[in-house]
Amino acid sequence: MTLASAEKEMVGVLTFFQKETRGFRTGKAHPALVETVTVEVYGTTMRLSDIASISVSDMRQLLLSPYDAGTVSAISKGILAANLNLQPIVEGATVRINVPEPTEEYRREVIKQLKRKSEEAKVAIRNIRRTFNDRLKKDDNLTEDAVKSLEKKIQELTDKFCKQIEELAKQKEAELATV
């Protein structure tokens, strides 16, 4: 494992954390709220983002425009089945979703999930560091100074990515608190 490959893995953890937390409902309409919803169409299961365009019509409303108007009712059923506490409104060939303001109880629950997910991401980052350091110590071709230098660099990367995860979590928490 090289320093570059360790950094690439850390970027992957950060990206995964961002995708996971994007789906948290903060009270503002965002396509990520529903894009991963699965819908039964054409005899198969597909992601909503693959069968409809998802746009934000205003701060609290999503507009879904299916590529095939015949899938409107399946989209509505898929959203209801996803248990997202969202009510789809079918309007001809489109589906509107009003995003309700989250309750205090929901906000507390999401903040708990957010803290758990951020801790999991930081643990994953630290595990990458540990794996890198273990491989360094087993490499007989490196001098002691080179090992120390690389350990310092991987620690700097670890600190950088853990800080980014904390900042993203704080932003999401602030978003939840201000709605």
Swiss-Prot record:
Give GO BP annotations, semicolon-separated.
Answer: translation; translational termination
Localization terms from the record: Cytoplasm
UniProtKB keywords:
Cytoplasm, Protein biosynthesis
For this record, an example GO cellular component is:
cytoplasm
Primary site of residence: cytoplasm
Which GO terms label this protein's molecular function in UniProt? Answer: ribosomal large subunit binding
Which PANTHER family does the entry mention? Answer: MITOCHONDRIAL RIBOSOME RECYCLING FACTOR PSEUDO 1 (PTHR20982:SF3), RIBOSOME RECYCLING FACTOR (PTHR20982)
What does it do?
Responsible for the release of ribosomes from messenger RNA at the termination of protein biosynthesis. May increase the efficiency of translation by recycling ribosomes from one round of translation to another.
The family database entries (HAMAP family) matched by this protein are listed as: RRF (MF_00040)
Family label = Belongs to the RRF family.
Name of the featured protein: Ribosome-recycling factor
Q: Which organism is it from?
A: Chlamydia trachomatis serovar D (strain ATCC VR-885 / DSM 19411 / UW-3/Cx)
Its gene name is frr
